Amino acid sequence: MTNIRKTHPLLKIVNHSLIDLPAPSNISAWWNFGSLLGLCLMIQILTGLFLAMHYTSDTATAFSSVTHICRDVNYGWLIRYLHANGASMFFICLYMHVGRGIYYGSYTYLETWNIGIILLFAVMATAFMGYVLPWGQMSFWGATVITNLLSAIPYIGTTLVEWIWGGFSVDKATLTRFFAFHFILPFIIAALVMIHLLFLHETGSNNPSGIPSNSDKIPFHPYYTIKDALGFLMLILLLMLLVLFSPDLLGDPDNYTPANPLNTPPHIKPEWYFLFAYAILRSIPNKLGGVLALVMSILILAIIPFLHMSKQRSMMFRPISQVLFWILVADLLTLTWIGGQPVEHPFITIGQVASILYFSIILILMPLASLVENKILKW
């Protein structure tokens, strides 16, 4: 008799995705981040659900309800900080996952890559709206500044912003709708993850060499289930270190002050994982130009597959592209640092140079390096 996991209509989907899935024999730890992102999403949905049981999305009580969660709810402080720092872990894994895709040429799986970009936007939107919910100073002013960017859209901008706000400023209506969207989006993300995996399993995983591995596959279980389990353990360890020893390390102290529309904080800045995009936005003196650069800083990922000029898929055997890739990583770290600095000399100039370098590497230098490497192959 055939095993039930191979015959049962539901179980066989799980079987083909997580157990009997043929996987390349040489995928490295960089391939762990997909499953780690799944773990992060589950942690966020679970902790978020328990937070939503005690949270109230009203401007008068939102801040107090978060205080109540931390002080009065059993292990409420733990749930709250797991959720807040879980978001940071989520973005660390996301950026590693995208970086892996760029380095090893995984973007040639177009459908998988494009769904991934949609997922990235959805997670960023969810994180932004979640940051507004505690209704602290940075929540309020962050929401005001970022939603205001849409007013740069010609003709319909101002109307659009007021429509999103549900009034003439960020107020009760805004908070309530942000809570509703923040609750529903993770489930939409979970559905998109299924589609992401569906497209991935049409082709099978890429591998570090970038060479088809059809002749050398191994079953996902037990080899990669145990490898993923190790990744889970390391992620949870890191998250717990953060939550239990310095839960406010990545947060902003301004968010412990209740929102006050009459008092603007000296430095309005988003959470650390948006700082690179914020730096690109600020480095352009024109409002619409800045907004376009902000959107393009992420949307540029959609152009990457069409800029692939190399005869090889992966960067494993392409030293010039490797150097450019790591300069790009350093550039993103520089932008992240600049995004958290005040708008004054020399930070303005550093930000502008780093922004130009970011777009130049992706749009010009990497394709050129690929063409040079193609020539070197013939020597």
From Swiss-Prot:
It is a multi-pass membrane protein. Heme b b566 binds at H97, H196. Binds 2 heme b groups non-covalently. Keywords: Electron transport, Heme, Iron, Membrane, Metal-binding, Mitochondrion, Mitochondrion inner membrane, Respiratory chain, Transmembrane, Transmembrane helix, Transport, Ubiquinone. GO terms for cellular component: mitochondrial inner membrane; respiratory chain complex III. The chain crosses the membrane at residues 33-53, 77-98, 113-133, 178-198, 226-246, 288-308, 320-340, 347-367. One of its GO terms (biological process) is mitochondrial electron transport, ubiquinol to cytochrome c. Heme b b562 binds at H83, H182. It comes from the Eukaryota. It holds the Pfam family Cytochrom_B_C. Its cofactor is heme b. The keyword Transmembrane helix applies. A ubiquinone binds at H201. Changing A23T: In strain: Isolate AF 21115. Heme 1 (or BL or b562) is low-potential and absorbs at about 562 nm, and heme 2 (or BH or b566) is high-potential and absorbs at about 566 nm. Component of the ubiquinol-cytochrome c reductase complex (complex III or cytochrome b-c1 complex) that is part of the mitochondrial respiratory chain. The b-c1 complex mediates electron transfer from ubiquinol to cytochrome c. Contributes to the generation of a proton gradient across the mitochondrial membrane that is then used for ATP synthesis. Belongs to the cytochrome b family. The cytochrome bc1 complex contains 11 subunits: 3 respiratory subunits (MT-CYB, CYC1 and UQCRFS1), 2 core proteins (UQCRC1 and UQCRC2) and 6 low-molecular weight proteins (UQCRH/QCR6, UQCRB/QCR7, UQCRQ/QCR8, UQCR10/QCR9, UQCR11/QCR10 and a cleavage product of UQCRFS1). This cytochrome bc1 complex then forms a dimer. This is Cytochrome b. The lineage of its organism: Eukaryota, Metazoa, Chordata, Craniata, Vertebrata. The gene is MT-CYB.
